[in-house]
């Protein structure tokens, strides 16, 4: 669980850096999903460009915060057998993913290049959560 939390932080850093690069758009989003790039967006509307940039930074911040919460709750609470820490460590990324993921599918932003790393980190997290849950349950018997 902690490893997946750290992976979420890594993805957030990557997301943050891309905002200031020539790529600008999110990882795995290209001309097949968005027909214009950074320069065209900025030329069309500097204020729209600034708004999109601020959203990228906000998402990066929330991804990092989610990863940090999951990692710290897992490392300092779940490892000690606290069920409340397990519940919180699971709830934090589940809430974030439940809000964020569905919006990707109707607009064609569900590419493996865009969501693949999140899917991988989520799979690692789920495996860790199941293993940790079994361990906590055995401790409480």
Predicted regions, residues:
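Hydrophobic alpha-helical transmembrane segments of polytopic
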Residues: 1-7, 59-62, 66, 85-96, ...
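N-terminal signal-anchor transmembrane alpha helix
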Residues: 1-30
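Structural signal for membrane-spanning alpha-helices in multi-pass inner-membrane proteins
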Residues: 12-15, 74, 100-107, 128-132
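A loop-to-helix transmembrane entry motif
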Residues: 24-31, 46-66
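Luminal/periplasmic active-site loops of membrane-embedded glycosylation enzymes
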Residues: 31-44
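Juxtamembrane helix-break-helix junctions at the cytosolic face
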Residues: 67-86
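Membrane-helix boundary connector in multi-pass membrane proteins
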Residues: 98-118
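Membrane-water interface at the C-terminal end of transmembrane alpha helices
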Residues: 123-141
């Amino acid at each position: 669980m902690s490893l997946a939390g750290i992976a979420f932080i890594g993805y957030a850093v990557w997301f943050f850096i891309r905002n200031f690069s020539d790529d600008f758009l999110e990882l795995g989003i290209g001309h097949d999903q968005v027909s214009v790039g950074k320069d065209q967006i900025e030329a069309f509307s500097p204020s729209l460009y600034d708004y999109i940039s601020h959203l990228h930074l906000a998402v990066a911040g929330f991804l990092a915060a989610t990863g940090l919460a999951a990692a710290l709750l897992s490392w300092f609470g779940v490892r000690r057998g606290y069920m409340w820490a397990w519940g919180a460590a699971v709830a934090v990324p589940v809430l974030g993913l439940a809000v964020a993921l569905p919006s990707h599918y109707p607009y064609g932003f569900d590419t493996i290049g865009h969501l693949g790393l999140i899917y991988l980190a989520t799979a690692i997290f789920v495996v860790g959560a199941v293993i940790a849950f079994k361990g906590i349950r055995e401790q409480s018997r």
